[in-house]
C-alpha cells in the first residue's frame, strides 16, 4: 500500500478510532494489499466493515474459530480483501480491550460483546427501583474488560425532586467506588453535554438491561433517530429493548458509540480482577485482617467484619462481593475443566490417527 493510500486510510478512519499504532499493527497486511476497516455490525457469518471506501459487506468464514472469544465482533479492526464477491475478512488486529460475559451462570462459555472499547457506559433506569447488585455485576465486567466504566442514570426527569435524586446518586456511588455517576434525561437534554464530553475521542459501549433507555440515549448522543425505539408503557415507565444487534456509530462530537441489545443475563467470565476493583474498599480492609487468608466469615481480628459492625461498610456490599466471587470461581473452574476435556479429546483424536497409521503400515508389511 502506498504512503498516499495509507494517509487516506488514516484520514477517513480517524473518526472511527484509527491511529498511528493501529496503522503500525496493520502494516504487514497493508503490504499484502488488504484494506483496514472497523467492524460496525456482525450478523450471521457476515459483517459490515467501515473502510476508507465506505461501508463494505464481508464474509467472516476465514475468521470463525471454535473459540467463541476469538470470533470477529463489533469494534474489531480487521483486514479485508479489496475485492471479490463475496469479499472476506482475513484477520483482525490484536484487541486492546474486550468486553466479555458468560453466556450462562451455569455454563463456562464466554461471549464477547465488544472490542477495543475505552469507556463502558452502564445505563440504569430511574423508572424502576435501583438494583445495586446488578450495577456491581456490570461494573465488574467493565473493569475486567480494561475499559473505564461510567454509570448513567437515565430518565432522571422521572425524579423531579433534587434531594431524592441526590440520594439515588449517592446510593449508586456506594456501589461504584471510583466510577463517575451521571444522572441524565434524554427527553429534556439534561446531562447529555457532560456525557458527550466524557465519551468523545474514544470508543464507548452502551450497556444495560432491557428498557434502561439505551436506544433513546444513543439517539440523543447521535442527534438522530438511528436506533429503533419502542413506546414506553405509561403505566410504569418501563421500556422494551429494541436494539437486536451490536452497532458501532460515529458520534458527531467525536468518538464512537457501540449500542448493545438489552442484557437479561450478565454472567461473569473470569472477572476476578474486575470484582476486586468494584469492591476495592473490601480489599483495602482485608489488608488489615489478622490472618492473610481471612475469609471474613467469623475469624478473630477480621477488619472487614469490624467495618460492618461499626457501620463503615454496608453488609450488603460484603454479601454481594461473596456472591460474585463464588460465581466467578465456579465459571473459572468449569472453564479450566472444559479446556482439559478439549485437550484430552485432541490427544485421543491424534492417538486414533497414529494407531490407524501404524495398522496401515503393518498391513503393508505383510
From Swiss-Prot:
Its cofactor is Zn(2+). It comes from the Bacteria. Keywords: Cytoplasm, GTP-binding, Hydrolase, Metal-binding, Nucleotide-binding, Ribosome biogenesis, RNA-binding, rRNA-binding, Zinc. Binds 1 zinc ion per subunit. The keyword RNA-binding applies. One of several proteins that assist in the late maturation steps of the functional core of the 30S ribosomal subunit. Helps release RbfA from mature subunits. May play a role in the assembly of ribosomal proteins into the subunit. Circularly permuted GTPase that catalyzes slow GTP hydrolysis, GTPase activity is stimulated by the 30S ribosomal subunit. Monomer. Associates with 30S ribosomal subunit, binds 16S rRNA. This is Small ribosomal subunit biogenesis GTPase RsgA. It comes from Streptomyces coelicolor (strain ATCC BAA-471 / A3(2) / M145). The gene is rsgA.
